[in-house]
Amino acid sequence: MKKILSIVLLILLLCSNSYAAVKKGKGEVTLSNQSVDWLIQYIRGKGSKKPMAFILSSNGAWSSYWYCGEGACRDGNFMPTIRKCEADTDTECGIFARRRTILWDNGVKPKKAVINSKWSDQEIKDKLKEWGFL
């Protein structure tokens, strides 16, 4: 019985999702032209790749993104990328978007700000401007 209980406990520990807090970006930010281009590229994905996370510096100049190349992806550990951003820019960095939902809290955007991958570049830029990111 102890053996079965130990195995069940081990399986639960190995298969559980991590609910650690993600460092979401906050504060006023204006995306640079390059960051906007990267965001558009990230939102659209290529082939079977699906957007996973878009990391941004608080000055809007540094950005990077993660893709999910498989169907059932779990969130990755973005902290090394956020730390690299902070080391490179000497500013605060955080997650700007998870999948196609903008998480950055600038006090202007609506709670549920989602970018459609079928929107044109101009439509995406217009929404970013409306939400206070341009």
Residue ranges and their predicted role:
Residues 4-15:
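Sec-dependent N-terminal signal peptides
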Residues 16-20:
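Sec/Tat signal peptide C-region and signal peptidase I cleavage site
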Residues 21-134:
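Secreted/extracellular ectodomain signature
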